[in-house]
Amino acid sequence: MKEVINSLNYLSNWPSAGSFEFNTNILETNIINISVVLGVLVYFGKGVLSNLLDNRKSKILNTIQNSEELCKGATDQLEKARARLWEVEKRVDEIRVNGYLQIEQEKENLIKAASANLKQLEDSKNETIFFEQQKVIDQVRQQISYQALQKALAIMNNCLNTDLHLRMIDYNIGRLRAKKPN
């Protein structure tokens, strides 16, 4: 770019040779002067412009290449993340299913344990009731036996006299002797 400006300055300071000169006033410039200036600009600016465009092109290509590499890396990371997400979701589903199964199993175990405890309590209750019934029955038997014995003794004492009492004793002693082996 500097070369173009220097060339234009050089041409503008060139001494005029009669009818040919550079008109620096843009409003008074004619088509020939403009075409000469454009020709000079194209001639001298071609290399600079070409270099600028080549540099810009290489920067754009590098940027595109870097972007493509970043995109590929991001795509790879996305695929890895999706694979990891799939594994995590699968593991979560397994944990959820195992958790539900374990909850159901614990529930069944608790129900079985509660049923066993209830049966054990029922058996214990029945045993206690049976024991208490037997105890009451034994007490009633004892009381009935005692009352019957008391009644029998009272009847005997009222009905028996001494003579009958002695005969009864002798009779029972005779029976006992008959049963006794010699």
Swiss-Prot record:
Record carries keyword Transport: yes
Pfam family of the protein (one): ATP-synt_B
Protein's UniProt keywords contain Plastid: yes
Cell compartments where the protein resides: Plastid, Chloroplast thylakoid membrane
Gene Ontology CC entries for this record: chloroplast thylakoid membrane; proton-transporting ATP synthase complex
Membrane topology type: Single-pass membrane protein
One MF term in the entry's GO annotations: proton-transporting ATP synthase activity, rotational mechanism
Keywords: ATP synthesis, CF(0), Chloroplast, Hydrogen ion transport, Ion transport, Membrane, Plastid, Thylakoid, Transmembrane, Transmembrane helix, Transport
Main location: plastid
CDD domains xrefs: ATP-synt_Fo_b (cd06503)
Transmembrane segments annotated in the record for this chain: 31-53
Additional facts recorded: In plastids the F-type ATPase is also known as CF(1)CF(0).
Family classification: Belongs to the ATPase B chain family.
Function recorded in the entry: F(1)F(0) ATP synthase produces ATP from ADP in the presence of a proton or sodium gradient. F-type ATPases consist of two structural domains, F(1) containing the extramembraneous catalytic core and F(0) containing the membrane proton channel, linked together by a central stalk and a peripheral stalk. During catalysis, ATP synthesis in the catalytic domain of F(1) is coupled via a rotary mechanism of the central stalk subunits to proton translocation. Component of the F(0) channel, it forms part of the peripheral stalk, linking F(1) to F(0).
Subunit record text: F-type ATPases have 2 components, F(1) - the catalytic core - and F(0) - the membrane proton channel. F(1) has five subunits: alpha(3), beta(3), gamma(1), delta(1), epsilon(1). F(0) has four main subunits: a(1), b(1), b'(1) and c(10-14). The alpha and beta chains form an alternating ring which encloses part of the gamma chain. F(1) is attached to F(0) by a central stalk formed by the gamma and epsilon chains, while a peripheral stalk is formed by the delta, b and b' chains.
Protein name: ATP synthase subunit b, chloroplastic
Species annotation: Welwitschia mirabilis (Tree tumbo)
Gene name linked to the record: atpF
